[in-house]
UniProtKB/Swiss-Prot annotation:
One of its GO terms (cellular component) is cytoplasm. The gene is rpsS. Belongs to the universal ribosomal protein uS19 family. HAMAP family: Ribosomal_uS19. This is Small ribosomal subunit protein uS19. It comes from Burkholderia multivorans (strain ATCC 17616 / 249). GO terms for biological process: ribosomal small subunit assembly; translation. InterPro entries: Ribosomal_uS19 (IPR002222), Ribosomal_uS19_bac-type (IPR005732), Ribosomal_uS19_CS (IPR020934), Ribosomal_uS19_SF (IPR023575). Disulfide bonds: none annotated. The lineage of its organism: Bacteria, Pseudomonadati, Pseudomonadota, Betaproteobacteria, Burkholderiales. Protein S19 forms a complex with S13 that binds strongly to the 16S ribosomal RNA.
Length: 91
C-alpha cells in the first residue's frame, strides 16, 4: 500500500541534517546512512549517499529520476549467483 499524499514523503531527520550540511559546505564526500526507508527528495540530487545493504555501504549517486523512490531500492541486499548447471544439458 502506498503512503498517503496527505502525510507527505518520509525522510529520517538525521539524514536531512546531513544532506543540508553537505549542501551548505558543497562537500562531495559520500553521506553514510543506514536509513534505507527514507524517500529521495529533490534536495538530494547531485549528492552521493552510501546506503547500507546489511554488509557494507553501497555508494549511490542521486539523479533526477530517482526522486520519489526509497534509498534501499538502489542498494541490493541479496546476491544471485545463478542456479546449478544441468549436467545433461552440457553434452
Amino acid at each position: 500500500m502506498a503512503r498517503s499524499v496527505k502525510k507527505g514523503p518520509f525522510c529520517d531527520a538525521h539524514l536531512l541534517k546531513k544532506v543540508e550540511a553537505a549542501a551548505a559546505s558543497r562537500d562531495k564526500k559520500p553521506i553514510k546512512t543506514w536509513s534505507r526507508r527514507s524517500t529521495i527528495l529533490p534536495d538530494f540530487i547531485g549528492l552521493t549517499i552510501a546506503v547500507h545493504n546489511g554488509r557494507q555501504h553501497v555508494p549511490v549517486y542521486i539523479s533526477e529520476n530517482m526522486v520519489g523512490h526509497k534509498l534501499g531500492e538502489f542498494a541490493l541486499t541479496r546476491t544471485f549467483k545463478g542456479h546449478a548447471a544441468d549436467k545433461k544439458a552440457k553434452k
